[in-house]
C-alpha cells in the first residue's frame, strides 16, 4: 500500500493532474518499474500514488517538475517566493497538507467512502494477481527498465532518464564483477551505495552501453517459493559505434514488503568478455549459458548459508558465476566440490 496519507494522496492526485498524459504514463513506468500496465490516465495516477513509498520520494522525481509544484501551490492559494527551489516547494506542499489535517477532523464524513471501497477492491485484485506472477514477463519488464535507466546515465546520450542510485537495491546488495578484456579480474562489492556507484561508473565514466538480448535464448528466469526471483540475461557491450564484446548478468530480486509489486535488487553477478576472447559469431546474438534450474541453485545455496557445516563450500558456489551445474540442498557431493568455474568464457 501507499506510504502517503489520505491528504497527501488527494493533494498529489490534484498536483499530478497538472501533468500531461505522456508525463503521467512515463512517471507510472518509473514508479512501478514498468511492472504495472495502466489502462488509462486515472489508472496510472492511482498506481503512482499506491506504489510511492512517501510523498517526498514522489515529488522529488525528475518528471515532477518544479514548475508543476509551484503551479499547484498557487492554485491552493499558498504564496511562495517565485525563486524558491524545488526542495523548498516540496516542503511548502507538505506543510500545506499537514495544516489541512485539523480541518478534516472537524468535518463529519462517512468513514468509508466510495473511493475507499474501490481502493480496497483494487488492492485485493492486485494481491490476488501477485500470486500468479508471470516471472518471464517480470524479468523482461525488469530488464527493459534496468538497462534503459542505466544506459541513460551515459553522458553521450543526453540527460539521464531518471534518478539512478541505491534506492533500487537492498541495503546489503552484492555485486560480483568479472571481466576478461585486455586483462582478467574479479572484484566483489557490497552495499547498495557502492554497488550502484560501480555500475554507474561503467556507463558514466567508461562510456559503455549494455544492449540486452531479450529473446528466449538471451533471457531466462526462475523463482523460489519464498519470493526470490532470479533473472539471467545476456547481451552485447558497446562504446560509441564499436561492439567491444558480450556480457552475461544474473540478478537476484526480492519483492519489497512495504510497496506492492515492487522489486529491489539483492545481488548481481556480471561477466563481461571482450571481443578478442570470443568467436565472431557469438557476438551477433549472445545467449544465456545456463538453464532456469541452474538459477534455482542460487536460491538453494542461499538458504543453506546459515548452516555452519556447509557455509565455507556454499560461499564458494555463491561467489562463482554461471551456475553450470544444478545445486540441490541435499547434494553433498556438489557442496563439497571446489569452486565452480566462473572464469571460463561464455559458451558459443
Swiss-Prot record:
GO terms for cellular component: nucleus. SUPFAM superfamilies: NTF2-like. It comes from the Eukaryota. May be involved in apoptosis regulation. The keyword Metal-binding does not apply. The keyword Metal-binding does not apply. Coiled coil: none annotated. One of its GO terms (biological process) is apoptotic process. Transmembrane segments: none annotated. This is Uncharacterized protein C3orf38 homolog. Keywords: Apoptosis.
